[in-house]
């Protein structure tokens, strides 16, 4: 039967994975702030550094419950800038870091957006050109068979989705964010796109057919946005100048 939403298949007791009921806390709008850098939605202002150990459990409904690397629960490190969480062992850390901790995704985004550290390729891009590049990538990501991921999951059809998924994502939402110019670099766009795969694995399991489709979407995204020097800057961007 056709899939009616992104991230999971129609409810079927024979194929639905067994999931523990643990509902992530709702994001408190009073705690939500937009980062000074255009990381995309659901990122927070950097707080003053402390010497206290970093959070090891999601707090205040600001963080996911599932590790960004292995997509499983457990004791996790919470990023100060985004909702992502990680197992220390998945990051191959020998000890828990002290003070405010920023995840690998946010570190890559910060480096890419900082004037002092961004690549020469990114310095050549205007906001409009970046938007054009990301729109082009999105069109490539909308391959035949990706229809389940092209719109938000219907909570009417899948009412338990919010019990597992902290930050829903789909291609339509990505497109809206691009139009609003919420991404300051290709790394930020890719990091947001990865929520599609992360969510799909959490809800459906790693071996589900939809998860394989989600992996293809992310591979296409990585290819389209990670080789700008050889593609966009040689052929696409010069035409926009």
Region locations from a protein language model:
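Chromatin reader modules
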Residues: 1-81, 88, 98-241
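C-terminal recognition-helix end and immediately following basic linker
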Residues: 93-95
């Amino acid at each position: 039967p056709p899939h009616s939403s992104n991230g999971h298949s129609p409810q079927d007791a024979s194929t639905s994975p067994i999931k523990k009921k643990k509902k992530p806390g709702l994001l408190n709008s009073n705690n939500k702030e937009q980062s000074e850098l255009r990381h995309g939605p659901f990122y927070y202002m950097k707080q003053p550094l402390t010497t206290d150990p970093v959070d090891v459990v999601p707090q205040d409904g600001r963080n996911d419950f599932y590790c960004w690397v292995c997509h499983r629960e457990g004791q996790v490190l919470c990023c100060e800038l985004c909702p992502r969480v990680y197992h220390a062992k998945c990051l191959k850390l020998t000890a828990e870091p002290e003070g405010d901790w920023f995840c690998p995704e946010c570190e890559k985004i910060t480096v890419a957006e900082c004037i002092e550290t961004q690549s020469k390729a990114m310095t050549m891009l205007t906001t409009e050109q970046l938007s054009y590049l990301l729109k082009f990538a999105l069109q490539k990501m909308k391959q035949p068979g990706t229809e389940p991921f092209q719109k938000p999951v219907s909570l009417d059809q899948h009412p338990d989705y919010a019990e597992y998924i902290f930050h829903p994502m789909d291609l339509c939402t990505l497109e809206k964010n691009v139009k609003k110019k919420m991404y300051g670099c290709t790394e930020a766009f890719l990091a947001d796109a990865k929520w599609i795969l992360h969510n799909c694995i959490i809800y459906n399991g790693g071996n589900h057919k939809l998860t394989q489709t989600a992996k293809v979407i992310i591979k296409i995204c990585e290819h389209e946005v990670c080789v700008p020097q050889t593609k966009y800057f040689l052929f696409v961007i010069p035409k926009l100048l």
